[in-house]
């Protein structure tokens, strides 16, 4: 078992592709954060105020159920966490993952995929969810075509996890 877990949520496979690239390069274990009820195209229509994703993101207490239980995190030192940016932050299903386990003593390295939006205050939000006993590193927005070389340069900046 690797000391690193790449956990990701991907609605359109963009984040999945980046997560798989990272897991392969870092020889990390991988876990897909999958909602119990998959999102449809209609659920993801951000222009529709009644769309499932819009309703979920408007409710700070919304924690959609996950299809699988979070893996036992005790053996992992580092969690590389990937997700798309929705409404300027991590999707509610990622919050479900973050509240489903104890992240004390873990290093969390977030990355997001987005057509243009950056991380904003997402890292602060994640830190507030997991608590002060976990260390959330500065996140980064990446495109679907990001090179592993670029990711390695970013990762190498985090001395604690190497």
Q: Predicted regions span which residues?
A:
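Short, glycine-/small-residue-rich phosphate/pyrophosphate-handling segment
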Residues: 109-146
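Short glycine/serine/threonine-biased micro-segments
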Residues: 80, 103, 114
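Short beta->alpha junction loops/turns
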Residues: 11-12, 84-86, 115-116, 144
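Short, surface-exposed, polar/charged, turn-prone segments marking secondary-structure boundaries
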Residues: 33-37, 57-62, 107-110, 125, ...
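Conserved helix-turn-beta segment immediately C-terminal to the redox Cys motif
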Residues: 100-106
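N-terminal beta1-alpha1-beta2 submodule of the flavodoxin-like/Rossmannoid cofactor-binding fold
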Residues: 1-81, 88-90, 95, 99, ...
